[in-house]
């Protein structure tokens, strides 16, 4: 992803890396990536690398740096982060113990923060979405606000990860945000809270169309999504709009489970790892909506596991895609726990069932529809009966005749 598209959910809400460089999917670093569920402990093989230079730098700093209180822990973490940064991969990164715990908290749907997602656009930190009922919404923050300062510190030059690390914090503490909105400068004092957020929300339109929004592909997504179909696909309700807009991704397995609700057999995605080895993931064949008409909504912030889902559904001819081109994150990361911290490392690229790579290219919808304003996007949790300004959702319903 381009550096100018970093998204992170403040664990604060916090979701970062979604992490990575550019849609920092939650402290997750700059964009929540597609994570595999396994956590592997790794013993490094013997290497011909000479580590004496690192040792000499460390010792010289400790002995001669003008400020004698340089922390050995800080230097070690900096060295680890620098080693990973040298890969030039925006989705690989070293996480401190606190950062790793924050990432895991987000995917569990429980975390402390303000309840907002941010995106890095060029040199600006922009609020992408505000979660209903959270401190961010209560304070009056709005999607599209540009964060110019946090606790008096300018955000100029910040990445999404930087924003996450400054805004998130313990429940009960306060953070001050300065934002620019329509040429005006506004200030907000926001008290962080513990937030429990479901990954799925639903609404039924005209007693015919089930609208399902997936906010992220976390540990509870498959169960919540299956329950949503079970509870609502009955009687005259037989068509579906699947909304993946602003969804930064998450677990590959969760995406596979969602795909399996619509595709009865075949491949969901292909993971290509080191050396070109391919792992073909298959659908489970136990879905509830194999024959239901389906439209999928995408936008420029749909990434990672969202794109895996949309790509598979498209390749299998199960749905029409509506919206604008997706983010374009075609890699998979895995967490390798360390003695102190975690290594979030790219271990594969993924392809759609038809062997298409969307990395840096994104997925182009069948029907391109833009929103005049980000705030026009339908908010199922806030105004379930008002979607009049959401031209993308309106187009999806029109395609279904709903």
Residue ranges of predicted features:
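Short acidic, Pro/Gly- and aromatic-enriched capping/linker segments at domain boundaries
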Residues: 339-349
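Extended, small/polar residue-biased N-terminal targeting/export presequences
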Residues: 62-126, 174-176, 180-189, 197-202, ...
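Terminal targeting/pro-maturation regions of precursor/exported proteins
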Residues: 2-91
């Amino acid at each position: 992803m381009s550096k100018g598209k970093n998204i992170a959910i403040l664990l604060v809400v916090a979701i970062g890396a979604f992490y990575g460089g550019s849609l920092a999917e939650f402290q997750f670093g700059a964009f929540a990536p597609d994570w595999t569920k396994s956590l592997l402990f790794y013993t490094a093989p013997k290497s011909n690398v000479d580590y004496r230079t690192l040792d000499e730098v460390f010792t010289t700093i400790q002995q001669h740096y003008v400020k004698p209180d340089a922390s050995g822990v800080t230097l070690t973490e900096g060295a680890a982060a620098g080693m990973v940064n040298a890969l030039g991969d925006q989705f690989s990164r070293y996480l401190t113990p606190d950062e790793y715990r924050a990432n895991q908290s987000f995917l569990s749907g429980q975390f402390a923060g303000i309840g907002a997602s941010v995106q890095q656009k060029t040199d600006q930190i922009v609020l992408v979405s505000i979660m209903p009922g959270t401190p961010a919404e209560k304070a009056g923050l709005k999607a599209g606000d540009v964060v110019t300062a946090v606790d008096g510190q300018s955000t100029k030059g910040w990445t999404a990860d930087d924003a996450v690390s400054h805004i998130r914090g313990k429940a009960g503490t306060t953070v001050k945000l300065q934002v620019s909105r329509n040429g005006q400068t506004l200030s907000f004092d926001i008290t962080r809270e513990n937030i429990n957020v479901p990954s799925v929300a639903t609404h039924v339109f005209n007693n015919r169309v089930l609208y399902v929004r997936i906010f992220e592909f976390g540990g509870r997504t498959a169960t919540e999504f299956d329950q949503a179909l079970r509870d609502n696909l009955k009687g005259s309700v037989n068509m579906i709009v699947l909304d993946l807009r602003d969804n930064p991704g998450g677990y590959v397995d969760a995406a596979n489970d969602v795909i399996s609700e619509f595709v009865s057999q075949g491949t969901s995605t292909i993971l290509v790892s080191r050396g070109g080895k391919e792992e073909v993931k298959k659908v489970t064949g136990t879905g509830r909506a194999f024959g239901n008409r389906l439209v999928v909504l995408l936008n420029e912030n749909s990434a990672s596991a969202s794109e895996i889902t949309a790509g598979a559904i498209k390749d299998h001819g199960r749905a029409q895609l509506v919206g604008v081109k997706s983010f374009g994150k075609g890699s998979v990361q895995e967490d390798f726990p360390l003695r102190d911290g975690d290594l979030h490392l790219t271990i594969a690229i993924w392809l759609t069932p038809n062997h298409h790579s969307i990395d840096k290219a994104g997925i182009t919808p069948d029907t391109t529809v833009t929103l005049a304003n980000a705030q026009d996007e339908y908010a199922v949790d806030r105004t379930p009966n008002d979607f009049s300004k959401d031209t993308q959702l309106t187009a999806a319903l029109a395609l279904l005749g709903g």
